[in-house]
Amino acid sequence: MLTATGLQKSFGARQVLRGVDLTVKDGEVVLLQGENGAGKSTLLHILATLERADGGKAEVDAFPLSDGVEVRSRIGFTGHRPGFYGELSGRENLELWAQLHQLPEHETNIDATLERVGLKSFSNDHTGIYSRGMLQRLALARTALHRPTTLLLDEPFAALDGDGRELLCTLIAEWRADNRAVLVVAHGSGLTVDRTLVLADGVVA
């Protein structure tokens, strides 16, 4: 479960978040929309502990964001421009991610994860030659590899073709059925959601 209360963030004189309150319950998919520049990505970065808020608080499974190790073990984040080590293969990138999260080998089935996102036949190719859509699929695999309880997806459909979009909708439905909390920033995705929130003027409604 993800909760945020009164989150604030400014960049210089511009206040992007003025007091954001939101809750995403376990087993719930929430769509977050808003104009470009409204602060959606900033909000997700704060919730993923990639940026610090200027004020307010947020918790993941009752752990405050300041408890970075616990929170990061529970969060899966996919940005709209996922980064990988281009000189490493898809499999090697996931193996590195598993090591960073100290995942036991018996809990990490990387081949099955790559197959699930349609990349098994490309798993030994360097990610530097992957298309944007393939990188997005690999990002989804990485996001789910450590079995997070909360998933934060920032424009995950943007680089995907029709098959990829269908796959992502299926994955999100599976995460929901697995009682995970899912917060998605997207436009016109056709995704089935439980609630839609709008970020405007620095607050969520």
What annotation goes with each model-predicted range?
Residues 151-155:
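Catalytic Walker B motif of ABC-type/P-loop ATPase nucleotide-binding domains
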Residues 2, 17-19:
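Conserved structural motif at the start of ABC-family nucleotide-binding domains
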Residues 56-71, 199:
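Conserved ABC transporter NBD signature motif
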